[in-house]
Amino acid sequence: MPDPSDLSRHTPMMQQYLRIKAEHPDRLLFYRMGDFYELFFEDARRAARLLDLTLTSRGESGGERVAMAGIPYHAVDGYLARLIRLGESVAICEQVGDPATSKGPVERKVVRIVTPGTVTDEALLEERRDNLLAAVARDGAVFGLAVLDLSGGRFTLQQPGSVAQLLNELERLNPAEILVSEDEPLTEELSGRRGLTRRPPWHFDPESGRRQLLSQFGTQDLAGFGCEHLGLAIGAAGCLLQYLRDTQRSALPHIRSIRAETGTEYIGLDAASRRNLELDWHPSGRAEFTLLGLLDRTGSAMGGRLLRRWLHQPLRDRTTLMLRQQAIGELLADRRFEALHDLLRGVGDVERIAARIALKSARPRDLSTLRQTLKALPALRETLHGTESALLGELTGRLVDQPELSELLQRAIVDDPPQLIRDGGVIAEGYHAELDELRLLSENADRFLAELEEKEREHTGLGALKVGYNRVQGFYIELPRSQADRAPVHYIRRQTLKNAERYVTPELKAFEDKVLSARERALSCEKALYEALLEILGRWLPALQDCAAGLAELDVLANLAERADRLNWVAPRLVDAPGIRIIGGRHPVVEQVGGTPFVPNDLAFGPNRRMLVITGPNMGGKSTYMRQAAIIVLMAHIGSHVPAAEAEIGPIDRIYTRIGASDDLAGGRSTFMVEMTETANILNNATAESLVLMDEIGRGTSTFDGLSLAWASAEHLARETRAYTLFATHYFELTALAEECEDVGNVHLDAVEHGDKVVFLHAVREGPASQSYGLQVAALAGVPQTVIDNARRKLEQLERQARSAHQQAAPVAQLDLFLPPEPHPVVRRLESLDVDGLSPREALNLLFELKQSL
């Protein structure tokens, strides 16, 4: 890229380009030239690589070949969407001057900046996923995290107390863009993220942030938001607001509040647990294999986004959960959910439309969609009439009619508007008299000219008179040369031809001025009227946002009612007493996508039963049994019904899972290291109110090492943490833990042998398993029979050796790792003593001897 400080060697157009580019060094600059957006120099090379564009060159400027690539202006949204997904930011530079009056390059300026976290255009967003902008400030080990959804207006603050907590929150939120200070060294996990944007350190100043928040919300302090003590997070929030003002170049009236989060109000879910429970992601990439894929039948996009947020932040507040349960129960009782579900399918994305109105970027079809949604409100309220649920009553109260707004939209916007205001034809006829006249002129020019020609023939008596038009002379009256001397005095000669004279009259000149610019003036008038309309619509922003929130929550509740009805789920009981009791529990996703009938199973945890050691065959269903327990608990804490015959759930603070593992090649961590990192997180952070799933701990190392770690981890969870723990293992030795810890029980997944085959019953039974059926599973997987036969011979050999070792070690019952240590000679001497036969003197002498031998 040429040095912008020395522009004298460049052409005037390149000078203009380089000056504008210097203001946006880290963004791709889309520079409008006619019907294309052009990119030059390094921007062109980068865009060509990212978008698979043809890279060309256009002569030289300043002694350097000008690399260039172009994008048609009418296709820009598709290219922007691809760049945003890649984490790129774009500055869009438009022609704002008039080419006809410009001396030198037409005046241009950046009119729009698009970044991953500030996108609001419908075409650039995933409709059912939040698009978040985050800012991170740091002071030692404490972080300030501010997160804003520009397209929805939600604004939150928190202060994670460690790098691990910060990364866990970022994993949950998955922001499209993260703002960090230019002088902040990044962790390895942060530095690899897309959409990372550096900002000046002073943008994170807490006092500056406080002033910006007070200005944004029009308050004198932040006490009402509960965040005055979160200095670091306030600094991060100030950085967000400044960044939005820099990029949006407009006020942000839809950002009306901010909420402080402590984390204690939600069930804790770390990144591993979200991944292992497959909430909204599956390794196959198939959405139908995820919990969200099964749950989401919402009618509106904003309902879908809210459901996703609920899944990732299950609540601990039982009052809110019971309100949701009661609402779902009432919708089920009289099947109102069916009518609601149908009505909500016609509801638009009012949340994002309101944000675009606030940012003055709403498109014509946004307004027609809003108009249709407002028309649906009376039917929704009528459907909810008479409900007793407090929550449904509150949501109904948010669906307020806006007759003035509805009337304005009906009067201002045509029934089926084009996508863009620049296309014209958006403002309805009758809304503005001048616009109607301009359109009439443009549309009826031919009729006017025919009428003028007839009128002039009558007035002059010249039958050969014609009224015509060409692009050079404009409109004219033409007379044959033979009749030119009879032209009226008010005719002004415009052009002389070989056989004719052409004239213009004041009336024709006035018409020409109107018609030639009528289209341009109509478009200009329409654009001004549309911008004024958006300004007027801003008055209804609070009401629209409140309505959107009500519609979204109503959509989720109706959706959960439909799922409960369709999939035969029940309302769980949320109780104060510790424990988890599930009768006939089912894994909701496996039940629906599996090819065979699902076998329900029970689970019982209580004050005196805190851990189940689960053994059984491979493919027997251990992981499914564990996951379904966690999913049922999670679903109960979003207010949903659950897949079970009965469920009773006591207080839960966190859900941890350690299920499956793979190498973290990018992070340089082996499978075993990943497993141990996740295990350490659980052992260090789980509490007596946590639900813990541990699957096959220790399998990534040697047998004795793995068994030792598995035993110690299970014992720590059982004795020290006392978390509700499902501990699946192939180490049969772990079943002995139940004999040492009264809170530990054994269960197994049942299977039966039929010849050389094994049939998995998937039923959970009390007690440990008898064997793992590994050879049978290998045969099912297609391992060659010769290998299976060889493995069976080796197994028999190993079992004979184990029996022999067991007999030699008798009467010790425990094998391998847990054989008791060889007793000390002093212990053996004491065990052989006849205490009753010793005299006092002999006892003292013996005690002295024993002391000497230690």
Swiss-Prot record:
PANTHER family (alphabetical): DNA MISMATCH REPAIR PROTEIN MSH1, MITOCHONDRIAL, DNA MISMATCH REPAIR PROTEIN MUTS FAMILY MEMBER
NCBIfam families, A to Z: mutS1 (TIGR01070), PRK05399.1 (NF003810)
Source organism (scientific name): Methylococcus capsulatus (strain ATCC 33009 / NCIMB 11132 / Bath)
Keywords: ATP-binding, DNA damage, DNA repair, DNA-binding, Nucleotide-binding
Annotated coiled-coil segments of the chain: none
Keyword Cell membrane belongs to the record: no
Protein name: DNA mismatch repair protein MutS
GO molecular-function term, one example from the UniProt record: ATP binding
UniProt-listed SUPFAM superfamilies: DNA repair protein MutS, domain I, DNA repair protein MutS, domain II, DNA repair protein MutS, domain III, P-loop containing nucleoside triphosphate hydrolases
Biological process according to GO: mismatch repair
Family classification: Belongs to the DNA mismatch repair MutS family.
Binding-site residues for ATP, renumbered to this chain: G616, P617, N618, M619, G620, G621, K622, S623
SMART domains: MUTSac (SM00534), MUTSd (SM00533)
Pfam families noted in UniProt: MutS_I, MutS_II, MutS_III, MutS_IV, MutS_V
GO CC terms: cytosol
Biological role: This protein is involved in the repair of mismatches in DNA. It is possible that it carries out the mismatch recognition step. This protein has a weak ATPase activity.
